[in-house]
From Swiss-Prot:
Pathway terms, separated by semicolons: Amino-acid degradation; 4-aminobutanoate degradation
Catalysed reactions listed for this entry: succinate semialdehyde + NADP(+) + H2O = succinate + NADPH + 2 H(+)
EC number: 1.2.1.79
Name of this chain's protein: Probable succinate-semialdehyde dehydrogenase [NADP(+)]
Keyword annotations: NADP, Oxidoreductase, Plasmid
Gene field: gabD
EC primary class: oxidoreductase
Disulfide links within the chain: none
Gene source species: Sinorhizobium fredii (strain NBRC 101917 / NGR234)
Active-site positions on this chain: E263 (proton acceptor), C297 (nucleophile)
Keyword Oxidoreductase: yes
GO BP annotations listed: gamma-aminobutyric acid catabolic process
Length: 491
């Protein structure tokens, strides 16, 4: 991999990351193509990355399989100690990791630093959880038997991470696998492979044995994903991305009856009831909608506001949105970075055009901005109805549609009227309403009077077509463990 000065000038320790982890393995090395990674804010070339294929993925799986038995044979304390070292190195080099993240993904540097801290928190959590993998004893039906349950690592894990949180998603998927005693083959998103490589470089310093962590770069993920899903030595796939790709991977895994953890698309409702603290709701909506320029799977995609407070909320919310500065993530005053590519720009423009044609009104923003890069103004659209595309499809950009409602039961039905079920938010003060709405919303995660709810201590995941399984918390570890029942007779 070759890094350019457009990236290294932002780094305190460029030599540490100059040769990022896992250049092609000698068994499959030779003449190969490379793909380019660009800064979406400036268009500058950041790096030339080896473009790997199915043969590389197969070789990585073989290395992971060879390392599986010795890695799982270590004590939980030994695995925990290495995770702790990785955690420490991540924190020591957090500024450089954040700079890499901002350069290749575009998000504001402050958000990038928070993401790196979040990644480190997952490593810390699972370094601790590695020592808490417990079995159980069962009361036997006869005196000559003893019955118990033990938990063992499932084996080699294939992980596929997205571009929108390229550091925290690596840690969230890999750390529980490593804690459980599994080896890993990781395929990072082609738009943002550099921070994953930097994290793996630090993992090498932490002392992970050869073959435990394996990185496969590729400009096109189809061949890599197919090899991970169909190779019988891979026992589990963990994927974060679109529901469409999730369906494809699930089909590819079906012949192997492979265990899967999928965190897929969302269409998150954000509901403001008339008894809500409006100023707090505005703050929460800004967080839930515009973090990472709206490019998050839990981004508020539909903002429902009860009629009695609609005008007040719309005015205060729009006023706040107008203060959000758009630009290069390295500018300390910037709140909204670029969209990831031109396709993302076209989608947000399509959603706005469709809404306006059907009677919506643009209150703020609505245009591309900047002389270069993929920037779009944070946009507020009012008088939105459910028939508009921006209310039915995940926009994945800084576009906030405001929908009016009168009846609480009706808005819950509207919020649930989607194939997705990842995250939902609502603001209210009436305790009876809080409990009823929280239980009625068909989502895996519900934020009540808050616009942010992700934590390493909480189970992250969705229902319906938003995913399978949970990441984070003690529950996230269970997805990497097999339960084995032992029955001892003749006693």
């Amino acid at each position: 991999m070759t890094l350019t000065s457009a990236l290294t000038r932002h780094l305190k320790c460029p030599e540490l990351f100059r040769n990022l982890a896992n250049e092609p393995h000698p068994s499959v090395a030779g003449q190969r193509q490379r793909f380019s990674v660009f800064n979406p804010s400036t268009g500058e070339l950041l790096a030339e990355v080896p473009d790997m294929g199915a043969a590389d993925a197969h070789a990585a799986i073989e290395r992971a399989d060879a390392a599986q038995e010795p890695w799982s044979g270590l004590t939980a304390r030994a695995r925990s100690d290495i995770l702790w070292k990785w955690h420490r190195f991540i924190l020591e080099h957090s500024d450089d990791l954040a700079a890499i993240l901002t350069a290749e993904m575009g998000k504001p540097l402050g958000e990038a630093k928070s993401e790196v801290q979040h990644a480190a928190a997952y490593l810390q959590w699972y370094a601790e959880e590695a020592n808490r993998i417990y079995g159980e004893t069962i009361s036997a039906p006869s005196t000559d038997r003893r019955m118990l349950v033990i938990k063992q690592p499932i084996g080699v894990v294939g992980a596929i991470t997205p571009w929108n949180f390229p550091a925290s998603m690596v840690a969230r998927k890999i750390s529980p696998a490593l804690a459980a005693g599994c080896t890993v083959v990781l395929k990072p998103a082609e738009q943002t492979p550099l921070v994953a490589g930097a994290m793996f470089a630090l993992a090498k310093l932490a002392g992970f044995p050869d073959g435990v962590l394996n990185l496969v770069y590729a400009s096109e993920g189809d061949a890599i994903g197919r090899e991970l899903c169909t190779n019988p030595k891979v026992r589990k796939i963990s994927f974060t991305g679109s529901t469409e790709v999730g369906r494809l991977l699930m089909r590819q895994c079906s012949d192997q009856i492979k265990r899967i953890s999928f965190e897929l698309g969302g269409n998150a409702p954000f509901i403001v009831f008339d008894d809500a603290d409006i100023d707090a709701a505005v703050d929460g909506a800004i967080q839930a909608k515009f973090r990472n320029a709206g490019q998050t799977c839990v981004s508020a995609n539909r903002i429902y506001v009860q009629s009695g407070v609609y005008a007040e909320f719309a005015e205060k919310f729009t006023e706040r949105v107008r203060t959000l500065k758009v630009g290069d993530g390295f500018d300390p005053n910037v709140a909204i970075g670029p969209l990831i590519n031109q396709e993302a720009l076209k989608k947000i423009e399509l959603h706005i055009s469709d809404a306006v044609q059907k009677g919506a009104r643009v209150r703020s923003g609505g245009r591309r901005t900047g002389s270069s890069g993929t920037f779009f103004e944070p946009t507020v659209v009012t008088d939105v109805s459910k028939t508009m595309r921006l209310a039915e499809e995940e926009t994945f950009g800084p576009l906030a549609p405001l929908l009016r409602f009168d009846d609480a039961d009706h808005v819950v039905r509207e919020a649930n009227d989607t194939i997705y079920g990842l995250a939902a938010y609502f603001y209210a003060s009436n305790l009876k309403r809080v409990w009823r709405v929280a239980e009625a919303l068909e989502y895996g995660m519900v934020g009540i009077n808050t616009g942010r709810m992700s934590s390493e201590a909480a189970p992250f995941g969705g229902v319906k077509q938003s995913g399978i399984g949970r990441e984070g918390s003690r529950h996230g570890l269970e997805d990497y463990l097999d339960m084995k029942y032992l029955c001892v007779g003749g006693l």
